């Protein structure tokens, strides 16, 4: 009896000793024999401290992505300065980034902590398809935004007419349709997924070499090439416009001095003003010419309104084009080259002639924008406030538009730089791994880090808009009820 009991006890001890290494292999402590951490009965593959750090960090990224992109969408639809047709591209980008945060990231958090897929093969395939679809849509939307900016800068007048809501929505639909064409082939058989799926089967993107080349070209490398070429062209165009503006400014400065020398009478001190307005009452000046007829003023006003609208829609016009299109029939009679660059320097230059050209105020200081009354022998008479000339108003709008376009190009460059830093490591790994032997495959932690580096791009886009775009910054503050 004693011998049998001892044998039974030894067998029980042996079986328990055999179970301990199995627990250690699953993830427990081989030295202490402790069981691995678990959450809701699901055994985790990493220590508890790593679970806490990973869960908090990745959840924070998800939260930032959701909040930021929701604010972008709400800003465009609720803040009037942002309610313009080209911002629908940004809405589409925000929706793509939002779907990454809602449909893709949470499953990856669970997969990172558990290190095995417990949601079944159907959910696995749908998750992988959504991953490729949403990330590709985000990248292609960036490409569409770059193209839209390029056309707006290089061909502002024509593209302002072509940039209709229907055209923009068609481009956005094309972006999502192309993303679906790139992401869907694995669902219809272009994959190397196993026929049977269990808890130990990894849920990962297919490594079928043909599809890897196809999807990487469509999702990343071709859009990257297009965006690089487009941004270089935008940079060159912006530099060219700045050089044209600098040349026009020098030419206009010389013209201003020449016109001032011809228009200033000897009785007016040259240090007080550079020229004298033809619309004020001075005994020293000849009587002003008759004002234009009502019919001519009506036509001029209508034409100027159209030019102003074209400038507003174009948002970035060549300096020579602006001056030529903005100057009405009452412009100063100068040479053709000077006429093209007249409105570039920012000085007030108004004219009131119909058949006879009269030079008017070209001043540097606010006090000399009205006619000086020094040396006048007649009693002072009230001076009516002078209306701002149309082409000066349009020139000011173009100066603002130029500043906006420079900021937009800079923002686009930053978005592209962040995009390359975030996604290039992932797609290099995605292309290289299927063509190398198993020994060159990266560790699961490195794969997870590179994957999340790509996901972070969806969180950074709204942050970039907030920092570098004043309208988005104001809209965010308004939505969050911050005082501006």
UniProtKB/Swiss-Prot annotation:
Residues 253-280, 361-378 have a biased composition (Polar residues). Residues 1-54, 110-126, 191-215, 434-448 are extracellular. One of its GO terms (cellular component) is plasma membrane. Residues 295-306 have a biased composition (Basic residues). Signal peptide: none annotated. Residues 78-87, 148-167, 238-411, 471-484 are cytoplasmic. Disulfide bonds join 124-203. InterPro entries: GPCR_Rhodpsn, GPCR_Rhodpsn_7TM, Octopmn_rcpt. The keyword NADP does not apply. It is a multi-pass membrane protein. It comes from the Eukaryota. Keywords: Cell membrane, Disulfide bond, G-protein coupled receptor, Glycoprotein, Membrane, Receptor, Transducer, Transmembrane, Transmembrane helix. The chain crosses the membrane at residues 55-77, 88-109, 127-147, 168-190, 216-237, 412-433, 449-470. G-protein coupled receptor for tyramine, a known neurotransmitter and neuromodulator and direct precursor of octopamine. Belongs to the G-protein coupled receptor 1 family. This is Putative tyramine receptor 2. It comes from Locusta migratoria (Migratory locust). The gene is GCR2.
């Amino acid at each position: 009896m004693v011998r049998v009991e001892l044998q039974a006890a030894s067998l029980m001890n042996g079986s328990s000793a055999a179970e301990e290494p199995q627990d250690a292999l699953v993830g427990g402590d081989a030295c202490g024999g402790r069981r691995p951490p678990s959450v809701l009965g699901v055994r985790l593959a990493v220590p508890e401290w790593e679970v806490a750090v990973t869960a908090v960090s990745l959840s924070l990224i998800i939260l930032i992505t959701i909040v930021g992109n929701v604010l972008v969408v709400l800003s465009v639809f609720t803040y009037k300065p942002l309610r313009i047709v080209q911002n629908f591209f940004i809405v589409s980008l925000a929706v793509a980034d939002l779907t990454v945060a809602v449909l893709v990231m949470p499953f990856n958090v669970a997969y990172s902590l558990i290190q095995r897929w417990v949601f079944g093969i159907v959910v696995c395939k749908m998750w992988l398809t959504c991953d490729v679809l949403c990330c590709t849509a985000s990248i292609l939307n960036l490409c569409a935004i770059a193209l839209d900016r390029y056309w707006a800068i290089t061909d502002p007048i024509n593209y302002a007419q072509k940039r209709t809501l229907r055209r923009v929505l068609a481009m956005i639909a094309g972006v999502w349709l192309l993303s679906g064409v790139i992401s869907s082939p694995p669902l219809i058989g272009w994959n190397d997924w196993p026929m049977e799926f269990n808890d130990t089967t990894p849920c990962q993107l297919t490594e079928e070499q043909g599809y890897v080349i196809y999807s990487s070209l469509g999702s990343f490398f071709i859009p990257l090439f297009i965006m690089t070429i487009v941004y270089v062209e935008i940079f060159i165009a912006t530099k060219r416009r700045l050089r044209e503006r600098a040349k026009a400014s020098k030419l206009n400065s010389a013209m201003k001095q020449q016109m001032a020398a011809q228009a200033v009478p000897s009785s007016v001190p040259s240090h007080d003003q550079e020229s004298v307005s033809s619309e004020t009452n001075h005994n020293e000046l000849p009587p002003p010419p008759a004002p234009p007829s009502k019919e001519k003023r009506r036509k001029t006003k209508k034409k100027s309104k159209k030019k102003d609208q074209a400038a507003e829609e174009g948002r970035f016009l060549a300096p020579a084009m602006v001056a030529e299109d903005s100057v009405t029939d009452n412009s100063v009679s100068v040479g053709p080259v000077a006429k093209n660059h007249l409105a570039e320097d920012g000085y007030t230059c108004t004219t009131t002639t119909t058949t006879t050209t009269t030079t008017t105020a070209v001043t540097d200081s606010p006090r000399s924008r009205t006619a000086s009354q020094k040396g006048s022998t007649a009693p002072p008479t009230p001076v009516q406030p002078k209306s701002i000339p149309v082409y000066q108003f349009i020139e000011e709008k173009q100066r603002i538009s130029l500043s906006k376009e420079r900021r937009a190009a800079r923002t686009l460059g930053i978005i592209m730089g962040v995009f390359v830093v975030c996604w290039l490591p992932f797609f290099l790994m995605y292309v290289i791994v299927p063509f190398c032997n198993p020994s060159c495959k990266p560790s699961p932690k490195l794969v997870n880090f590179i994957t999340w580096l790509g996901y972070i791009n969806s969180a950074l886009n709204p942050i970039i808009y907030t920092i570098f775009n004043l309208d988005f910054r104001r809209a965010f503050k308004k939505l969050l009820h911050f005082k501006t």
